[in-house]
Swiss-Prot record:
Known function: Produces ATP from ADP in the presence of a proton gradient across the membrane. The catalytic sites are hosted primarily by the beta subunits.
Sorted UniProt keywords: ATP synthesis, ATP-binding, CF(1), Hydrogen ion transport, Ion transport, Membrane, Nucleotide-binding, Thylakoid, Translocase, Transport
Annotated protein name in UniProt: ATP synthase subunit beta
Domain of life: Bacteria
Assigned EC number: 7.1.2.2
Organism: Prochlorococcus marinus (strain MIT 9301)
Amino acid sequence: MVATPSTSSQTKGVVRQVIGPVLDVEFPAGKLPKILNALRIEAKNPAGQDIALTAEVQQLLGDHRVRAVAMSGTDGLVRGMEAIDTGAPISVPVGEATLGRIFNVLGEPVDEQGPVNTKDTAPIHRAAPKLTDLETKPKVFETGIKVIDLLAPYRQGGKVGLFGGAGVGKTVLIQELINNIAKEHGGVSVFGGVGERTREGNDLYEEFKESGVINADDLTQSKVALCFGQMNEPPGARMRVGLSALTMAEHFRDVNKQDVLLFVDNIFRFVQAGSEVSALLGRMPSAVGYQPTLGTDVGELQERITSTLEGSITSIQAVYVPADDLTDPAPATTFAHLDATTVLARALAAKGIYPAVDPLDSTSTMLQPSVVGDEHYKTARAVQSTLQRYKELQDIIAILGLDELSEEDRLTVDRARKIEKFLSQPFFVAEIFTGMSGKYVKLEDTIAGFNMILSGELDDLPEQAFYLVGNIDEVKAKAEKIKSEK
């Protein structure tokens, strides 16, 4: 959706050059559009087919010309076509009507569900909130997922990097977070699909419908809005779709005063698209061929994702690391903005531990006594040191067996296995697949449960009782059930 001002204020230009997704447009003297304004081209191509294209002004060239980047394919565009300056940046629909719908970078619905029932729109380019409007006190964002809340807690209004290969449970974890924020925090979510596969976007949409995150019968009951700019789209669309999703999230934060979850999959593709556009505009490449404006491009997006006094946007960003090189400028620049990292491990998924969050690799700046309190901090560190010791002993166990360990080490292994099992839990969104009802575990229950395992109070309970349960009361009930079945 693009702002369309009154006819009297419209300035008309003429397309003078088209090179791939980049076009040069000439305007009358003194009437050049501003940088970031949207240009609209509506015409018929030589074959008689309709063209409706939006482009964003990126450079002023001199000689009354501007250079713009197209948001869709430029096939059929010819020199001499009329381009209209809309007088404003690209705008997208915002508000409750966006929930349950799929949009493209321009805010046009692409789910064949008809037009969006709202007149509220907002420009995708805006300044980050003022420092005086920010919520500066760090506050933990409770997710109800034990392993995250205990070992790598999220910051409300913070940014989390989600690392994981294919098939380790990224999508299910994302769905559970969307479900939990809706039920426990009364919040909504926005999903920005940036430069990923169309098939994955379609699968995600179908899974959201299946798990109830999107209510196909009554869209007003849905908990998420989706905004996609996929791999096959021009770099302009992939570069801006993250901002379109963020704009929808900002409305829920600033106008509805809600806590919002913003998912970006994948933040690397946003950088990659910026690099392509930079090259098309003729800018000199910087380190490893990336755009010279890499830092500001990422910063402009990330600085808008924050907590204000009215509400918060907590962002979870999938991060692709090219060739597993963490020093690559794209992931390295992203890391500077992250408050926490959630790493999904294939080895845990293979053991059937879901969510497969790696308790030793996942980190958070929130895990410090001054923020989470002494009890939480000490429990988390004790859990990690127990698991680390178990990891060190695994080679010895594989070669010599458990019997060769000292009494103390055997006890450590026993407790570590219980901790590993207790870090798993059944998800609400997976109920239809597992047949087990989902669990939301309060932070105090999580801390109390792990303290009981570490102190040895539960040494006599079987390991299996700790697997896929919520709090410690369920462990005891499951242990009784196992005992009665023997």
